[in-house]
Amino acid sequence: MLAAEPELAGARNEKGQSALLLTAYSGNKELCDVLMACGVPLELHEAAALGRLERVKQLVEEMPAEAKTYSPDGFPVFALAAVFGHLEVAEYLFSKGADINAAATNGTGYNALTGAVASGHTAIVSWLLANGADPNYRYGNGFSPLLTAAANGHLGIVSILLASGADLHVKTNDGKTALGFAQERGQAEVAEFLRSHGAA
């Protein structure tokens, strides 16, 4: 179908999300490659999500304020680079004025740190925290990066967050703790680590 109608690769839904961006969200790298081969020029949020640093640089150099913009579905371009694990892109956007704590405008409240934590990108989490990301940022139902890391079993990230000042005793709006999430999800190593740091 794409061979006959390559313009479909640039199609967008009612939220303004392109086929390429939705494919990136799904993690299907092979299909992303197929869509990009159709020659549709990448917009900044797509280039950031896909880690295309040269395209990101080209677009930001043409319009510097773009480094601080959002995708059509409300995510900071900077956060998309972080959630998909593209440290060089995140570093570049930050150097051009992207707000390290910028939150999504779509009701999720996600930012670069929450996305990198959820995706398990330890190096990016460390870099974000070293450059001013808030380790106690709250979003959704009172979630924090530590709660997400504990629930997902990311022990290294839990350690980095605590070393960066994350509140060990933080609770969601319905009273769940990092230790509670770790135990509930069977994350035994994380649970033991949290207990060794005073969680109860």
Please give the residue ranges for each predicted region:
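Alpha-helix initiation and capping sites
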Residues: L2-E5, N28, A37-V40, R52, ...
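Ankyrin repeat domain, specifically the short helix-to-loop turn at the C-terminus of the second helix
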Residues: L2-E7, V34-V40, V60-A65, E91-D99, ...
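Ankyrin-repeat boundary/"N-cap" motif
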Residues: R12-S18, P41-E46, T69-V77, A103-A112, ...
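Ankyrin-repeat and related helical/solenoid repeat scaffolds used for protein-protein interactions
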Residues: N136-E184
